[in-house]
C-alpha cells in the first residue's frame, strides 16, 4: 500500500527544479507576464447563491496581498440580468486600493459607466463578441449595433481619462454557432482597438479551443492588432486552458486572464466550465522562469478562503496537489 506524504511547509517543493529546466526548445517566451485576475467578477457572477459583500471585499484584498497587478473587481450590469453583481458600488468602494494595482470593472453601457465612475472606478471594460448569434442572445443586438452602444462609453472614458479594456468573446468557438472564423475575431479585435481600447482580451468563452485553433486565431489577429495590446482569456472546459495559454506566450502575448481557484464560466454559454486557475498559471509561469510578481502561497490562501466561503472544491490542480492532508 502506497504511503501518502504530507505536504512540506512551503507546499511547492518542485518549483526550484522546474525553474532550472531548459526552455530553449519552447521558442521565445516573455520575461514577464501580467496576470489579470478575473475571479471576483467573472469567477463569481454565475454562482447561484449570492456571495455576501464582505466576502467579495476580503477576497479582493487577499488577491491584492498576493501581488496580482490587475484584479477585475465587479460588474456594473443590471441586477436583473446578473443579480450576483448588484452590490458593485459597495464592493468597489469597500476594497483596499493597493498602490500599483488596477481594479477595472465591467461597464456594458453608459448607465453602468456613470455608476462605476461615481463609485471610484479608474479603469473599465467593455465586451464584444466574434459571434453574431452570441451577441444577439447576450445583448439583444448585432455585433455592429453593439459597437454603436460602446461609442458613448468610449467618448466619456476619454473625457474622464479612464482606460478601457476590450473583450472579444467566442474567439475560439461559440455555444450557438460552433466554429468562429479567425478573420471575424481579428475584425472585432481591430474595431475595439481602433475605438481606443488599450488592451484586447481574446476569450475562449466555452473552452473548446485547442493549441492549433489558438495559433490560427492569433495569427489572424496579429495582422490587425499589436501583440503588446493583446491578452488571452481561456476557459478549461476541455482541459486545454494551460496549453492554449502557452501557445499564446510562444506567439508573444504577455498578458493572461485567469481566475483564483478556477472559478467562473459564462451565464450565457451552455456547458462552459471554469476559467484557467490563477494558481496553475502562476505555477507554470514560475517553472518557465517567467516573472509574475505573484506570491503563490498567498494566492493559494485566497483560493482556500473563497472556496470555503462558497462551500465548494477548488478547480486548481496546484491547490489540490498542495493541500494539507
From Swiss-Prot:
One of its GO terms (cellular component) is peroxisome. Pathway: Metabolic intermediate metabolism; (S)-3-hydroxy-3-methylglutaryl-CoA degradation; acetoacetate from (S)-3-hydroxy-3-methylglutaryl-CoA: step 1/1. In suckling rat, highest levels in liver and in intestine. Lower levels in heart, kidney and cerebellum. Weak expression in brain cortex, medulla and midbrain. Levels decrease slightly during weaning. Residues 1-27 form a transit peptide. GO terms for molecular function: carboxylic acid binding; fatty-acyl-CoA binding; hydroxymethylglutaryl-CoA lyase activity; magnesium ion binding; manganese ion binding; metal ion binding; structural molecule activity. CDD domains: DRE_TIM_HMGL (cd07938). The modification N6-succinyllysine is found at residues 48, 137, 179. Keywords: Acetylation, Disulfide bond, Lipid metabolism, Lyase, Metal-binding, Mitochondrion, Peroxisome, Transit peptide. Its EC number is 4.1.3.4. Residues 33-300 form the Pyruvate carboxyltransferase domain. It catalyses: (3S)-3-hydroxy-3-methylglutaryl-CoA = acetoacetate + acetyl-CoA. The active site is at residue 266. PANTHER family: HYDROXYMETHYLGLUTARYL-COA LYASE (PTHR42738), HYDROXYMETHYLGLUTARYL-COA LYASE, MITOCHONDRIAL (PTHR42738:SF1). Mitochondrial 3-hydroxy-3-methylglutaryl-CoA lyase that catalyzes a cation-dependent cleavage of (S)-3-hydroxy-3-methylglutaryl-CoA into acetyl-CoA and acetoacetate, a key step in ketogenesis. Terminal step in leucine catabolism. Ketone bodies (beta-hydroxybutyrate, acetoacetate and acetone) are essential as an alternative source of energy to glucose, as lipid precursors and as regulators of metabolism. Homodimer; disulfide-linked. Can also form homotetramers. This is Hydroxymethylglutaryl-CoA lyase, mitochondrial.
Amino acid at each position: 500500500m502506497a504511503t501518502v506524504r504530507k505536504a512540506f511547509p512551503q507546499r511547492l517543493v518542485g518549483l526550484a527544479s522546474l525553474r532550472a529546466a531548459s526552455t530553449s526548445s519552447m521558442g521565445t517566451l516573455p520575461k514577464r507576464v501580467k496576470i489579470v485576475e478575473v475571479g471576483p467578477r467573472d469567477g463569481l457572477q454565475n454562482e447561484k447563491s449570492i456571495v455576501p459583500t464582505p466576502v467579495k471585499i476580503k477576497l479582493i484584498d487577499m488577491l491584492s496581498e498576493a501581488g496580482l497587478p490587475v484584479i477585475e473587481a465587479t460588474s456594473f450590469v443590471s441586477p436583473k440580468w446578473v443579480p450576483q453583481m448588484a452590490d458593485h458600488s459597495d464592493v468597489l468602494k469597500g476594497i483596499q486600493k493597493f498602490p500599483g494595482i488596477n481594479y477595472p470593472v465591467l461597464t456594458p453601457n453608459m448607465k453602468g459607466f456613470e455608476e462605476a465612475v461615481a463609485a471610484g472606478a479608474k479603469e473599465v471594460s467593455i465586451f464584444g463578441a466574434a459571434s453574431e448569434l452570441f451577441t444577439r442572445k447576450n445583448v439583444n443586438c448585432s455585433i455592429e449595433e453593439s459597437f454603436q452602444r460602446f461609442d458613448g462609453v468610449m467618448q466619456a472614458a476619454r473625457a474622464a481619462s479612464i482606460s478601457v479594456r476590450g473583450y472579444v468573446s467566442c474567439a475560439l468557438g461559440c455555444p450557438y454557432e460552433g466554429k468562429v472564423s479567425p478573420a471575424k475575431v481579428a475584425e472585432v479585435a481591430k474595431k475595439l482597438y481602433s475605438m481606443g481600447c488599450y488592451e484586447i482580451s481574446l476569450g475562449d468563452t466555452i473552452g473548446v479551443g485547442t493549441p492549433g485553433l489558438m495559433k490560427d486565431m492569433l495569427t489572424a489577429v496579429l495582422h490587425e492588432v499589436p501583440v503588446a495590446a493583446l491578452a488571452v482569456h481561456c476557459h478549461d472546459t476541455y482541459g486545454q486552458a494551460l496549453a492554449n495559454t502557452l501557445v499564446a506566450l510562444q506567439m508573444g502575448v504577455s498578458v493572461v486572464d485567469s481566475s483564483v481557484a478556477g472559478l467562473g464560466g459564462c451565464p450565457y454559454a451552455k456547458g462552459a466550465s471554469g476559467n484557467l486557475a490563477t494558481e496553475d498559471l502562476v505555477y507554470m509561469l514560475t517553472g518557465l522562469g517567467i516573472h509574475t510578481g505573484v506570491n503563490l502561497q498567498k494566492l493559494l490562501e485566497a483560493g482556500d478562503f473563497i472556496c470555503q466561503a462558497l462551500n465548494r472544491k477548488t478547480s486548481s490542480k496546484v491547490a489540490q496537489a498542495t493541500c494539507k492532508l
